[in-house]
Amino acid sequence: MEATADGPAETQSPVEKDSPVKTQSPAQDTSITSRNNADRGRVLALPEHKKKRHGNLPAKSVKILRDWMYKHRFRAYPSEEEKQMLSEKTNLSLLQVSNWFINARRRILPDMLQQCGNDPVIGHKMGKNAHATHLQSTDASVPASSGPSGPDNVQSLPLWPLPKGQMSGEKLPDPESAPSQKLTGKAQPEKKVKFSITSPFSPEPVSPEEYADFSSFQLLVDAAVQRAAELELEKKQDPNP
């Protein structure tokens, strides 16, 4: 009988102890789940908060930076001193100013140059064409000054004064047949001609005294004419040769 009485008591005690635990477990699970959801919401909201903090710069600061870039649009690379000055004006850090210029040179500067009519692509092409034209003109002027003399280059050469005999179409005498003229040519002193680099390339005026003396040649011509006249007169006087 004692064993049977103790048996039910022992079987009821675990039920009484376990029943309160089972009734409290759903509330604990709900609180844990709500805490986890709240933590997840904070984690998801954290990047948005950071994005708002590190978003666009103030409009006033951007206007100051844009004005500086437009003023220096042909050399939009501020020095360290200029970055420090812009940082003080815009209340931004040096890193923010540097990053803004890096992005602005790729996104804002090309449109700014096109609006001003200074397209960097067109300007680069025009510079190449002008350089090529200058090289062609330089190459074309070199043969005219230092190239060999040909039929095409004769017209560009300056006209030098010709001796009196060549201008009249007479043939110059042979140096061996006129020894007196040969001696006269040796006796003449050498003349130095000065050229000026700054003034146009033109010869100095030469006096008639500096030309070669053709008096001996004129004497030979007169003697030949006189001899021909004598022969003609002899033929007329002697009808029967």
Curated annotation (Swiss-Prot):
GO molecular function: DNA binding
Coiled coil: none
Chief place where the protein resides: nucleus
Span list, region Disordered: 1-58, 130-209
Its biological purpose: May have a transcription role in testis.
Entry-linked PANTHER family: HOMEOBOX PROTEIN TRANSCRIPTION FACTORS
Protein's recorded name: Homeobox protein TGIF2LX
Organism: Pongo pygmaeus (Bornean orangutan)
Lineage, broadest ranks: Eukaryota, Metazoa, Chordata, Craniata, Vertebrata
Encoding gene (name): TGIF2LX
